[in-house]
Structure formats: C-alpha cells, structure tokens
Amino acid sequence: QREIETPEPQGYEVLLKTVACGVCHSDVHIHDGYFDLGGGVQLPSPLPGGEPLTMGHEIFGEVVAVGEDVEGIEIGSKYVAYPWMGCGDCDLCNDDMTHYCANNSNLGIHVAGGYGDHVLVPDTKYLFDAGDTPDSLAGSYACRGLTAYSALKKAGPYTKDNSLVIVSAGGLGLLALK
C-alpha cells in the first residue's frame, strides 16, 4: 500500500470521493496479469507498463471538487462514474463511441479507479445519476448492468413465440432476469 496525492480537478474534471466500488471478475484478471481464455490460453491484462494502478471500475461516488469549467454539478451530489473512456481524439471517440476506442483510458483499468479514496473523472459527461439505486449497487450497473443489457439487446427481438435461456445465476445472469 502507498499513499497517493488526492488529485485537484482542472477544466471539466470532477473529483469523486469513492462511496462504493464493485469487484468485477475482470478486476481479478487484471490483478493476476492476464485474462484466462481457457485451454491454457492467456491474454495479457492491460496494465500500463507495470506501473502501480488503483483498480476498480464499478464506481459510485460523491462530488467533492470540480474543475473551473464545470457547470451543473454540485458538491455533495452522488453519481455513477461511467468507466469506459476513449482517447478523445479518434473517429470513434468523436462519434460518441468511446467504449470501442483502441487507445482507451478506462477508469480502474488504464488510469486510477475507485478502489482508492478518490477518483478523478475527466469530464461531467461520464457522470450519471443513479436514481434510487442503493449506493452499494449503483456503480456495478456501469459494467455488469451494461453487459447484461447489451447481451439481451443483441439476442432480441422478443415475441411470445420465441424463448431466451439465461444460463447462470451469477451477477450477470440474475441481472438479466430482472
């Protein structure tokens, strides 16, 4: 463990105090240094050059500071931090498809995430109101929630004449049932 300076937000950045941060199975792979693809095949994890990294991408936090260009975000408000961030310069990022960017800077995977006391979110567009979702679950919806939703959307359309089988009763499978 080491102490890391609390960042000071600039421009459109927002500093969140971590309220809750889920543990995703991807975090286990990143910690281990590889994704186990089965059959002895391993895909190296995306850790940046062996540098220490504060992991955690299922982030829910409270705004404690904002950059000078931020408008409409109040200190004390709580938000889910959308972790899937692109480079901001490529065609995909310019078309608001940052989650497909090959040069991404995902929170908790490529840049400091929510397992620390604070996380610096680069822009207010990555903050989402969690509504009445419990604090302990809110951040996980930016990962497991989107994963389950995306799978269901790709499997559709649904009618009374077709069926869908959800195999598994883990976090993703149970959320898909909701």
Describe the function of each predicted region:
Residues 29-36:
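Short Gly/aromatic-enriched secondary-structure transition segments
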Residues 117, 132-178:
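Mid-domain Rossmann-like dinucleotide-binding core that forms the NAD(H)/NADP(H) cofactor-binding site
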Residues 58, 77-78, 92, 118, ...:
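Residue-level marker of beta-strand positions
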Residues 25, 85-100:
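Local cysteine-cluster metal-coordination motifs and their immediate loop/turn environment
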Residues 5-21, 36-91, 131-133:
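Glycine-rich beta-strand-centered segment in the early N-terminal region that forms part
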Residues 36, 101-107:
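Short cysteine/histidine-rich zinc-coordinating motifs and their immediately flanking basic loops
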Residues 91-92, 110-122:
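A structural motif shared across PLP-dependent enzymes of the aminotransferase-like
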